[in-house]
């Protein structure tokens, strides 16, 4: 498990903590928050959908018929299909639903997200992600920081779909904290730092408009406050919390994607008198949840995020 929390206005890192894995055969977590690449899963959806909101291609009220599964490659959802992966499904089976963009993010629907994004240009989405620092080092004072990577999208028929739901991209935990900080602080760039009493982030350049920042924050708050929100376990009286759960299959070197291990996360913000604090909790290779039969970001990482917030901001 690794945890990073930072002040989204100053960039000051408030918490950077890690615990060792019990299975060191596959996981070496020395400075994992800065070095380790992972596919963030649904925590990336706010950016991929946000790129279309910025371009006025969609807004929060656009509605879609959302089935349980969607085929990007013909026949790929058939039980006897053996070709390249081209079938995407929601986490739990459901009847077709009419959902708007706000509800799709609230429920973290993979199929809904793919339907929103699939008529867009993948290069435009990549450019939007790069504005937030994905694909570049954050510059935090930790040796060996990774810059992450993007897939070769022009060679991949399903990459637009997989990128929209947080696959086909490698990120670091610090990159996710930086990206969410830009959303939380009103849309300005941020330099994360382990140093105290920072003034380096004053007058930073604007990455997205204040209006877009506010709209994306409302969508993230609804993930916690909405009746069907995947982050509703984070609700606490007196706190304003927004964020996004993330669940992705763990990639094991030399083996491939695991069917039993998952990188589960919650990345989000808490409003405080000193500005929004942004945090990320990741469980690397999680195999179970203490509160649910399902291994998800909502059932593993979100409870840890909640306990940290209670101690970090106890005066709410």
Map each language-model feature to its residues:
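Beta-lactam-recognizing serine transpeptidase/beta-lactamase-like catalytic domain environment
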Residues: 1-36, 50-287, 297, 301
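Short, gly/Ser/Thr-rich active-site loops of penicillin-recognizing serine hydrolases
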Residues: 204, 296-316
